[in-house]
């Protein structure tokens, strides 16, 4: 009997820090108003549906109330998965709703972010959710008082070390984020948003030259190559080469330096702008053509066509002394980048080995 293949398990969605903070705030304010401790909290998410959160803690105090929720990021656990998100709500003078961050919520120290310098790193959509939730409850109970909401994350400062917050100038903790309220497993939206934010910070720091890398290792090599540039100028693009280049052009960068290694940059050279391992295979015929243009023998060209990895091709060209091959590959990367974004920006590309040995560089000037 033929075995029926199992359907892949559907990945479970999670909730953003912004959604958790909002649900905790609703519970805390309801407790403050009614004097009754809550067990759970239901809110309406920006994505267009209701969600109910279990409360880890809910406490009524003399002049305030506190509620907390453990963030569940679903089947795509991020740096803040398992974070305890606490909201403390208290009455204040006037009728304003004041939103601030406490322990473990970062504070903005650099321009270029959607939150002004000096403010707690609670992004615009979560701020709106917090404010509207408080306004709705106050209206429901016909209360005309001011409310202060303080969001805290006890382990936030430690968790922030696994994020780009320090690079972006967000110090002291994590950011309260989320535009939809939910975390979609393995979504690229969050990573792309972080790229846009990093470029904005670079621009606000008066950087006109940025270095974009595929990860931490290539960034380290780039920092050694361009020691004159500030930390804000270095941006990890991951696999999103085309997207990052377009954002650099859109935000007015004058020069972009690509720094990376053979595997992913072999794809960029052949015109692939999304370099995930599953997005497109390495074209070894293309690498063989570049090798031939660099003076490689017919025998070596055939060996390259039968190679298994781009790193293997790099080793073959290094061992045979064809160092101009790497410059040729960098030249192709620059041409691919300019084809992607058009003129008006200068592009240079540098190639390194996994161990950090410099292989080659090329520059192309956009008209």
From Swiss-Prot:
Pfam family, one: CbiD
EC number: 2.1.1.195
Pathway this chain belongs to: Cofactor biosynthesis; adenosylcobalamin biosynthesis; cob(II)yrinate a,c-diamide from sirohydrochlorin (anaerobic route): step 6/10
UniProt signal peptide: none
GO annotation terms (biological process): anaerobic cobalamin biosynthetic process; methylation
GO molecular function: cobalt-precorrin-5B C1-methyltransferase activity
Record key words, sorted: Cobalamin biosynthesis, Methyltransferase, S-adenosyl-L-methionine, Transferase
Domain of life: Bacteria
Keyword DNA repair: no
Reactions performed catalytically: Co-precorrin-5B + S-adenosyl-L-methionine = Co-precorrin-6A + S-adenosyl-L-homocysteine
SUPFAM superfamilies (UniProt xref): CbiD-like
Similarity field: Belongs to the CbiD family.
Alphabetical list of HAMAP family matching this protein: CbiD
Name the UniProt record assigns to this protein: Cobalt-precorrin-5B C(1)-methyltransferase
Organism: Priestia megaterium (Bacillus megaterium)
């Amino acid at each position: 009997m033929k075995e029926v293949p199992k359907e892949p398990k559907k990945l479970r969605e999670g909730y953003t820090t912004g959604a958790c903070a909002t649900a905790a705030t609703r519970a805390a304010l309801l407790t403050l108003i009614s004097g009754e401790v809550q067990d759970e909290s239901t809110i309406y998410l920006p994505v267009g549906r209701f969600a109910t959160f279990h409360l880890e803690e809910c406490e009524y105090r003399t002049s305030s109330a506190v509620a907390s929720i453990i963030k569940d990021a679903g089947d795509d656990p991020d740096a803040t998965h398992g974070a305890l998100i606490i909201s403390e709500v208290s009455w204040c003078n006037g009728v304003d709703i004041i939103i601030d961050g406490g322990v473990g919520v970062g504070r903005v120290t650099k321009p270029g972010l959607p939150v002004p310098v000096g403010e707690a790193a609670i992004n615009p959509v979560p701020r709106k959710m917090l404010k509207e939730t408080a306004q709705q409850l106050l209206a429901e109970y016909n209360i005309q008082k001011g409310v202060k909401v303080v969001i805290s994350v006890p382990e936030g400062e430690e968790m922030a070390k696994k994020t780009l917050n320090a690079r972006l100038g967000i110090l002291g903790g994590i950011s309260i984020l989320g535009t939809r309220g939910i975390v979609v497993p393995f979504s690229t939206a969050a990573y792309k948003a972080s790229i846009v934010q990093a470029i904005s910070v670079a621009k606000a720091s008066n950087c006109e030259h940025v270095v974009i890398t595929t990860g931490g290792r290539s960034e380290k090599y780039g920092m050694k190559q361009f020691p004159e540039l500030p930390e804000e100028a270095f941006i990890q693009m991951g696999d999103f080469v085309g997207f990052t280049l377009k954002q650099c052009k859109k935000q007015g960068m004058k020069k972009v330096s690509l720094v990376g290694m053979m595997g992913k940059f072999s794809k960029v050279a052949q015109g692939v702008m999304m370099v995930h391992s599953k997005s497109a295979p390495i074209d070894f015929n293309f690498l063989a053509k570049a090798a031939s243009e660099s003076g490689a023998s017919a025998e070596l060209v055939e060996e390259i066509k039968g190679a298994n990895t781009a790193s293997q091709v790099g080793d073959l060209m290094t061992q045979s002394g064809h160092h101009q091959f790497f410059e040729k590959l960098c030249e192709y990367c620059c041409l691919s980048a300019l084809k992607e974004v058009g003129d008006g920006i200068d592009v240079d590309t540098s190639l390194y080995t996994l161990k950090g040995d410099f292989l080659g560089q090329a520059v192309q000037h956009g008209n």
